[in-house]
């Protein structure tokens, strides 16, 4: 059956001489893979809308069997987000986000994730200064999607929400109040404490407007990268490369 949908290309690879298989995250079906016949031919009109990170309209022949690939009929490029490809750091941020979404099961719709993904890639492309912040917030947001959410807004040792948070532990992956502070915890200032509280109380868009210094953002970046590696069990090449760029006092 024919369907029309919008989506962002998460992955694309050659299949046979003139064909590709792409995976997109769509408004109608969530993650879905498509076989794109003939798109590697010079005269193909579909080749522009199926590149990595392309946001496009797709007309597809939807497979009735979930074990068979759906087929692309036509693609129409809406936005290539091409500025991302010109900057190594921006590419890392976008690739971390898309690799997380790519890890999800096929055809489980989550429209809020679709909107957040599209917004995140758009901001990274158009407002490069927000790129790392968007990436980190998305990584925290994605923990909710996979059911692995942590709560740093309370002390992870005594569970108090009354005592102010003064540090975060990279060993126990939790926050610490002044009564539970250990030497292996990293002391944080009020700005980072407030930003962390905002992550767990407010939505993605609200958190984008919260102030955070470069050093504090780097602390949070290192924390969430380590959490994905040690607790979630996900650590992509882009995550590793980003970790090599992060420094904090």
From Swiss-Prot:
Signal peptide residue numbers: none
GO cellular component entries: bacterial nucleoid
Transmembrane segments: none
Keywords: DNA damage, DNA recombination, DNA repair
SUPFAM superfamilies: ArfGap/RecO-like zinc finger, Nucleic acid-binding proteins
UniProt keyword Heme, yes or no: no
Gene3D superfamilies: Nucleic acid-binding proteins
Keyword Transferase attached: no
BP terms from Gene Ontology: DNA recombination; double-strand break repair
Similarity comment: family membership: Belongs to the RecO family.
Protein purpose: Involved in DNA repair and RecF pathway recombination.
Protein name, as recorded: DNA repair protein RecO
Record organism: Mycoplasma mycoides subsp. mycoides SC (strain CCUG 32753 / NCTC 10114 / PG1)
Lineage, opening ranks: Bacteria, Bacillati, Mycoplasmatota, Mollicutes, Mycoplasmataceae
């Amino acid at each position: 059956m024919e369907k029309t949908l919008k989506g962002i290309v998460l992955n694309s690879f050659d299949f046979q001489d003139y064909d590709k298989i792409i995976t997109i995250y769509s408004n109608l079906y969530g993650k879905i893979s498509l076989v794109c016949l003939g798109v590697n031919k010079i005269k193909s009109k579909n080749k522009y809308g199926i590149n990595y990170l392309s946001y496009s309209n797709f007309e597809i022949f939807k497979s009735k069997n979930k074990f068979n690939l759906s087929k692309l009929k036509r693609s129409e490029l809406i936005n290539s987000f091409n500025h991302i490809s010109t900057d190594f750091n921006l590419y890392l941020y976008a690739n971390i986000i898309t690799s997380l979404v790519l890890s999800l099961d096929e055809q489980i719709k989550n429209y809020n994730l679709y909107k957040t993904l599209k917004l995140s890639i758009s901001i990274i492309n158009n407002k490069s200064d927000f790129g790392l912040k968007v990436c980190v917030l998305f990584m925290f947001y994605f923990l909710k999607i996979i059911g692995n959410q942590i709560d740093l807004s309370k002390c992870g040792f005594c569970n108090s929400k009354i005592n102010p948070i003064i540090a975060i532990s990279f060993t126990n992956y939790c926050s610490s109040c002044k009564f539970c502070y250990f030497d292996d915890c990293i002391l944080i200032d009020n700005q980072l404490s407030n930003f962390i509280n905002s992550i767990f109380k407010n939505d993605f868009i609200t958190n984008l407007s919260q102030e955070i210094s470069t050093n504090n953002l780097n602390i949070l970046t290192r924390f969430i990268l380590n959490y994905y590696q040690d607790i979630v069990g996900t650590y992509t090449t882009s995550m590793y490369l980003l970790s090599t760029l992060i420094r904090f006092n």
